[in-house]
């Protein structure tokens, strides 16, 4: 498996704690401001007794318009929990996942400020579902490598023209599979790292908002 910033439970999680000169009430107030500044259409789940605030967020990873004018978007989703107490706080960023969403444009007569309708949405938990997908990709890659080695070990000197052509096609198909698999690995890692960088940045902005002390 490529090296991703996962904790022992196999999740992308940035957790931390810090000291502050602020009281719990002041920190809760600043944390709410931070949430509204960093999350679109934020809904806060607040537990006043524990000083806990939780909010979900997402950001766009990729967007592609298809030939049929449908749009496919991939978004990273996550949840942030901040627990405030007098002069100290703790935070975690977890429940990371990806949504693959397909949008279809409305007909003009149906449009009233909204241009697209979501017709399909698939949630991929991270890293759980991605680990399964990548394990499948590794197995496929191993199978293709075995087929390629078998083909290369054969004596092609006695092949007829049609068989050689089929052999070349199989080689090309195998090469295409290798390329697609490698591209997939890079895409998955880029998405993971983009998410990690984004979450790390969020953690730093929260630290600044709360005037955290070293």
Regions found by a protein language model. Give the residues of each.
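Ser/Thr-rich, low-complexity intrinsically disordered terminal regions
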Residues: 1-214
